[in-house]
Amino acid sequence: MSMVYFNIFMAFTVSLVGLLMYRSHLMSSLLCLEGMMLSLFVLMSMTILNNHFTLASMAPIILLVFAACEAALGLSLLVMVSNTYGTDYVQNLNLLQC
């Protein structure tokens, strides 16, 4: 495994550990999810370019589209929760159930 792949894998791991440790605030959880998606995008793009997978060249762009949709939904949920309750604690999300 080259150092570039190792660094990208470490970025994913640090984001995952951050997601597991700092899950009380919604904003920190969203930032960790974005870090994971960004490292997956870079890893997928580099793997496709290095191995010459021409049929899978659209996969990183599709992943980036899903990451953008996830970020938009997460930020809209963050705005709604912070306007309603004044904080961005994840415990407030249980109050949104019908």
Swiss-Prot record:
Its EC number is 7.1.1.2. GO terms for biological process: ATP synthesis coupled electron transport. Its main location: mitochondrion. It holds the Pfam family Oxidored_q2. Keywords: Electron transport, Membrane, Mitochondrion, Mitochondrion inner membrane, NAD, Respiratory chain, Translocase, Transmembrane, Transmembrane helix, Transport, Ubiquinone. It is an enzyme of class 7 (translocase). GO terms for molecular function: NADH dehydrogenase (ubiquinone) activity. The chain crosses the membrane at residues 1-21, 29-49, 61-81. It is found in: Mitochondrion inner membrane. It catalyses: a ubiquinone + NADH + 5 H(+)(in) = a ubiquinol + NAD(+) + 4 H(+)(out). Core subunit of the mitochondrial membrane respiratory chain NADH dehydrogenase (Complex I) which catalyzes electron transfer from NADH through the respiratory chain, using ubiquinone as an electron acceptor. Part of the enzyme membrane arm which is embedded in the lipid bilayer and involved in proton translocation. Belongs to the complex I subunit 4L family. This is NADH-ubiquinone oxidoreductase chain 4L. It comes from Otaria byronia (South American sea lion).
